[in-house]
Curated annotation (Swiss-Prot):
Gene Ontology process terms (BP): fructose metabolic process
Domain of life of the organism encoding this protein: Bacteria
Gene label: fsaB
Localization in the cell: Cytoplasm
Functional summary from the UniProt entry: Catalyzes the reversible formation of fructose 6-phosphate from dihydroxyacetone and D-glyceraldehyde 3-phosphate via an aldolization reaction.
UniProt keyword annotations, A-Z: Carbohydrate metabolism, Cytoplasm, Lyase, Schiff base
Entry's family note: Belongs to the transaldolase family. Type 3A subfamily.
Protein name stated in the entry: Fructose-6-phosphate aldolase 2
InterPro entries: Aldolase_TIM (IPR013785), F6P_aldolase (IPR023001), TAL/FSA (IPR001585), Transaldolase_3B/F6P_aldolase (IPR004731), Transaldolase_AS (IPR018225), TSA/FSA_arc/bac (IPR033919)
GO MF annotations in UniProt: fructose 6-phosphate aldolase activity
Organism for this UniProt entry: Escherichia coli O6:H1 (strain CFT073 / ATCC 700928 / UPEC)
Active-site residue numbers: K85
Assembly description: Homodecamer.
Length: 220
C-alpha cells in the first residue's frame, strides 16, 4: 500500500516523514490557500521534503478541459513527475483523456460515487480519490463507495488505483484499507491521532518504573 500526507505544511511533512513510511504528499487548492504561500513556492519545498522518490500531487483550477490541460502542463514543467489532480466533471474527464495522451499522470479527484470513479479510471487516471467522510456527510456510505470502486477497478481498470481521501478519524482510514484500498492520504490531525495512544505511554511508564525500581536506571 501507499501512505500519503494531505497537507502543504512543509515542516510537518519533514517531521512525519521521519516517522511514517510515506509515499508522498497530496495537496488541493484549499490546502495551498491555507498555507498562504504561492503554489510555485510551496510545491518545490514539498518535493524536497519528500525526496526525489516521493510523489507529489497538485490540482488544476480551470473549469474547462483546455484550461485544465494548460495548467497541468505548467505543473509538470515546474515539478517533473508531479501527479496532476483533475476534478471528475465532464470537462475533467475530457482533460484526463487528453493528459493521458500527453503522458501526464493524473488523479481523478472529488469523487463521490463508484461510477464517477470508474469513469475517471477508464478515461486514463492512474489514481482515483473517493472522498470518504464527505460521502458520509451527505448521507452516503464512504467505505462502501470505496469497496465498490475498488472492485470495479480490479475488474475493469486494473492499471488504476484507489487513493482514498477525506478522513476525520483513523478508524475510517483503517476501514478503507480493510476494504482493499491500495492507497490513502491522511490529513495531519488524523495522522497525529494514529500516533497519540495514551495506553502506550502508560505501558512504557510502567516498564520504566519497574526497571528503575530493580536496577536504579531507566537504561539498559
Amino acid at each position: 500500500m501507499e501512505l500519503y500526507l494531505d497537507t502543504a505544511n512543509v515542516a510537518e511533512v519533514e517531521r512525519l516523514a521521519r516517522i511514517f513510511p510515506i509515499a508522498g504528499v497530496t495537496t488541493n487548492p484549499s490546502i495551498i490557500a491555507a498555507s498562504k504561500e504561492s503554489i510555485w513556492e510551496v510545491l518545490p519545498r514539498l518535493q524536497k521534503a519528500i525526496g526525489d522518490e516521493g510523489i507529489l500531487f497538485a490540482q488544476t483550477m480551470s473549469r474547462d478541459a483546455q484550461g485544465m490541460v494548460k495548467e497541468a502542463k505548467h505543473l509538470r514543467d515546474a515539478i517533473p513527475g508531479i501527479v496532476v489532480k483533475i476534478p471528475v466533471t465532464s470537462e475533467g474527464l475530457a482533460a484526463i483523456k487528453m493528459l493521458k495522451k500527453e503522458g501526464i499522470t493524473t488523479l481523478g479527484t472529488a469523487v463521490y460515487s463508484a461510477a464517477q470513479g470508474l469513469l475517471a479510471a477508464l478515461a486514463g487516471a492512474k489514481y482515483v480519490a473517493p472522498y470518504v467522510n464527505r460521502v458520509d456527510a451527505q448521507g452516503g456510505d464512504g467505505i462502501r463507495t470505496v469497496q465498490e470502486l475498488q472492485a470495479l477497478l480490479e475488474m475493469h481498470a486494473p492499471e488504476s488505483m484507489v487513493l482514498a481521501a477525506s478522513f476525520k478519524t483513523p478508524r475510517q482510514a483503517l476501514d478503507c484499507l480493510l476494504a482493499g484500498c491500495e492507497s490513502i492520504t491522511l490529513p495531519l490531525d488524523v495522522a497525529q491521532q494514529m500516533l497519540n495512544t495514551p495506553a502506550v505511554e502508560s505501558a512504557i511508564e510502567k516498564f520504566e518504573h519497574d526497571w528503575n525500581a530493580a536496577f536504579g536506571t531507566t537504561h539498559l
